[in-house]
C-alpha cells in the first residue's frame, strides 16, 4: 500500500495520469472454502483487515462494481470477496462459469514503469547526480569501498563510503565480492504478448489470476506424445496455479499479456536466457481455463506474438531484502521476483532510510536480513503461499 501511494503521488507530480489504471488484481478459484486465503489477507492487512475486507455472498449489483472510468484516485481500497456466481458472471463475463470465488484486490493496476523510471533519472540528473555505466569487477573494503568498473572507456576506480547492492539477478555475485552470502536465487520466468484481434478478453478486465492447480487440456494424442518425452512429461501432469492474463495498454490497444510461473528451477543466469519453445502454447492453454474464449487461439497465435522472459530474483519466502548487508556501509535492495514495479517506490524509500540512518518504519527489520533471526515470522512466512507471478 505504501509503495502504491508513492507511485500515485508520482503520477500526480508528473501529470501522467493517462498511463495508469487501477483496476486492481483479481484472484479466482473454483473453491468455496477460502479460509487460508482470508487468513493470508488478514496477515497482510494487519489491524485494518476487518474494515478492508468486504464480503459479497448474494447478488446485489449496487454493492460492488468491478470497474468504471472514474478517476484512479477515487478507486476503492481493500479487497472485495465475491462468492455469488451470478455476481461474478455479471462483472467478469469472460470467466469460466465454474469460478466460485473472486478476491478483487483493489489497490493495484497497471502503470508505465519506463516513463516513471525516466522521470526519476531526470530528477536525479537535475539534482547533480551522474550515472556511470559499467560492470563491477571487484569491490575492496578498507576504510572505504573501492569499486573497479569496466566501462566503455576502460577500467575506472570509484571510492565511496557506502554502497547499495541493487544488482537484481547479479545481487548474489556482487555480495560475493564482499564475501557475503545472500539467501537469494534466480528462476527463469516467461511471458507472451499478442494482439487480441478475436476480442477474447474484455479490455477493462483487471489483471486476473487463476489460483487453482490444473491439468492442461491436451488431446489424447498430444498427451501420449508428451508423456514419451522425459523433458516434457511434466506438462501432462498437474501444474501449479497462478497463470495470469491482462489487457496491455490503453486506448486502441488490442494487446494481451499472459504469464505462468510454473518453473521453480534455480538456475545460473545468462544475459540472454534460453526460452522454452513450447511455452506460448502452454501458457495459452493454461490461461484458457479461466478465460475459455482464449481457446480460439489454440494452435494459431497471431504471427506477431512476442515471447520473452527474464530472471526472477527471490528468497525462499519470496519477500525482498532491503537493508544492511552484514558489513558496515553496505546495503542491499533486491529479490523482488515478479513485484518489482509495485514495490519499487517503497523499497527505495526504505533503503534510503537505512543508508541515511533516518527513522525506520516498524516493518523495516522484517524486510531486511534481520528477519531470519525472527523465528516466529519465518515460521509464518514459510506457511503462506509465496505468490509467484
Language-model features: locations:
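Short beta-strand to alpha-helix junction loop
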Residues: 31-34, 103-122, 272-281, 338, ...
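A non-catalytic, amphipathic alpha-helix used as a structural packing/dimerization or gating element
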Residues: 2-9, 43, 119, 278-289
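Short Gly/Ser/Thr- and Asp/Glu-enriched loop/turn motifs at secondary-structure junctions
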Residues: 20-25, 187-189, 305-307
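Glycine-rich beta-alpha-beta "Rossmann" dinucleotide-binding loop(s) and their flanking helix/strand
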Residues: 173-191, 358
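Flavin (FAD/FMN) cofactor-binding core of flavoprotein oxidoreductases
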Residues: 74-89, 265-266, 273-342, 349-355, ...
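Active-site lid/adjacent beta-loop-alpha segment flanking the redox-cofactor pocket in flavoenzymes
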Residues: 196-327
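Helical element adjacent to the flavin cofactor pocket in flavoenzyme catalytic cores
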Residues: 96, 102-162, 166-170
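Dinucleotide-binding Rossmann-like beta1-alpha1 core, especially the glycine-rich loop
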Residues: 1-87, 91, 240-243
Amino acid at each position: 500500500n505504501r509503495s502504491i501511494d508513492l507511485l500515485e503521488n508520482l503520477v500526480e507530480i508528473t501529470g501522467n495520469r493517462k498511463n495508469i489504471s487501477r483496476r486492481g488484481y483479481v484472484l479466482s478459484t473454483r473453491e468455496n472454502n477460502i479460509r487460508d486465503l482470508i487468513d493470508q489477507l488478514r496477515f497482510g492487512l494487519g489491524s485494518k483487515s476487518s474494515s478492508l475486507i468486504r464480503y459479497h455472498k448474494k447478488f446485489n449489483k449496487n454493492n460492488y462494481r468491478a470497474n468504471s472510468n472514474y478517476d484512479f484516485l477515487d478507486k476503492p481500497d481493500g479487497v472485495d470477496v465475491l462468492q455469488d456466481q451470478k455476481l461474478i458472471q455479471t462483472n467478469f463475463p469472460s470467466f469460466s462459469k465454474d469460478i466460485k470465488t473472486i478476491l478483487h484486490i483493489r489497490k493495484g493496476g497497471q502503470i508505465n514503469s519506463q516513463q516513471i523510471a525516466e522521470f526519476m533519472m531526470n530528477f536525479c540528473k537535475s539534482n547533480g547526480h551522474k550515472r556511470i555505466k559499467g560492470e563491477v569487477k571487484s569491490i575492496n573494503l578498507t576504510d572505504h569501498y573501492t569499486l573497479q568498473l569496466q566501462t566503455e572507456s576502460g577500467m575506472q576506480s570509484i571510492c565511496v563510503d557506502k554502497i547499495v547492492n541493487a544488482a537484481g539477478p547479479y545481487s548474489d555475485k556482487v555480495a560475493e565480492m564482499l564475501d557475503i552470502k545472500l539467501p537469494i536465487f534466480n528462476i527463469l520466468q516467461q511471458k507472451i504478448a499478442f494482439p487480441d484481434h478475436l476480442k477474447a478478453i474484455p479490455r477493462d478486465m483487471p489483471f486476473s489470476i487463476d489460483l487453482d492447480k490444473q491439468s492442461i487440456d491436451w488431446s489424447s494424442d498430444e498427451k501420449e506424445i508428451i508423456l514419451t518425452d522425459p523433458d516434457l512429461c511434466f506438462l501432462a501432469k498437474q501444474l501449479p496455479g497462478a497463470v495470469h492474463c491482462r489487457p496491455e495498454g490503453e486506448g486502441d490497444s488490442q494487446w494481451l499479456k499472459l504469464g505462468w510461473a510454473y518453473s521453480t528451477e534455480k538456475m545460473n543466469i545468462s544475459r540472454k536466457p534460453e526460452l522454452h519453445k513450447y511455452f506460448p502454447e502452454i501458457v495459452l492453454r493454461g490461461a484458457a481455463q479461466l478465460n475459455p474464449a482464449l481457446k480460439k487461439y489454440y494452435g494459431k497465435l497471431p504471427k506477431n506474438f512476442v515471447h520473452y522472459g527474464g530472471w526472477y530474483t527471490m528468497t525462499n519466502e519470496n519477500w525482498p531484502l532491503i537493508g544492511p548487508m552484514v558489513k558496515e556501509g553496505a546495503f542491499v535492495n533486491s529479490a523482488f521476483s515478479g513485484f518489482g514495479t509495485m514495490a519499487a517506490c517503497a523499497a527505495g524509500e526504505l533503503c534510503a532510510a537505512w543508508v541515511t540512518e533516518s527513522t525506520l518504519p516498524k516493518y523495516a527489520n522484517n524486510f531486511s536480513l534481520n528477519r531470519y533471526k525472527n523465528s516466529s515470522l519465518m515460521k509464518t512466512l514459510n506457511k503462506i503461499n509465496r505468490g509467484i507471478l
